[in-house]
Amino acid sequence: MKNYLVFDAGGTFTKYALMDENAEILEKDKVPTPDYRTKTKEDYYAVLDGVVEKYRNRIEGIAISMPGMLDNKDGYCVTAGYLAYLAGSTVGTELSKRYGIPVSVENDGKCAALAEFWRGSLKGCTNGAVVVLGSGVAGGIILNGKLFRGNHFTAGEYSYVCTDAKKPAEMESYWGLNSGAEGLARIIAKHTGENWQTYDGLKIFGLANDGDEKVLAELKEYTDSLAVQIYNLNIYLDLDIIAIGGGISQQPLLHKYLQRSLDEVLENIPLRKISPYVPEPKITNCRFYNDANLIGAL
């Protein structure tokens, strides 16, 4: 059976795994990602060099999941998120020449969708989507049984969606800031007066699960906003199912509140007075959480 080296490049760490062709993880670890504010592309490639050298004689190829708008055919990065030093580079081609083996590159949100479509919560669907609640809101879209990338590789870049038409010049008006995990932290901090950076998913849901009424109220505000965008996404694409991913999606309380918020949206739609039918999105959790990008990249 053939083995591959798969990277999931994030802003803080780059995870990697030795995987077989059935996406079974044989070994897994991570290395720090060089800071884009002080480091260069060559610094990042040097980090990859160290990992590749470790597995060079055991792999048939390399697959990479990374942020940004990119062309999966050659790995050209229009943007690269927190790996800004890779923007404008044809990463797939460059690394293939560097290591002498095939290298594929795909957007991280699209990798999550591919993983769920291959072996997870979207398996067997014709039209579906993944919404990943991370630092921002990422994801991917499956249409007619295939990953939909769009003409400019931006399909599924939900963070760019404007959610407040009255304030399009403010960052808080975009889905990426107000509905990612950081968005939830910002909502809570706004009402407590604390620095939002003191809140992470574990702290927020620790308080929520302990019955903190203030945190529960802010969680409801967060899921109300998220539910509206999920409703809109389903209206645009008429999907079989929408899978919610990201670290905080592992919290049962989030799914409970999100489903409740979505039910309220559907119950209160005034269009029911005109038409008895209103499209109702079906949501579920992603099957693969932290490993989704690794599996989808393969």
Predicted regions and their residues:
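Phosphate-binding/catalytic loop of phosphoryl-transfer enzymes
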Residues: 9, 21, 61-63, 69-172, ...
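ATP-binding/phosphotransfer module of carbohydrate and carboxylate kinases, centering on a glycine-rich
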Residues: 1-61, 72-74, 97-100, 118-124, ...
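Short loop/turn microsegments at loop-to-beta-strand junctions
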Residues: 2, 14, 66, 136-137
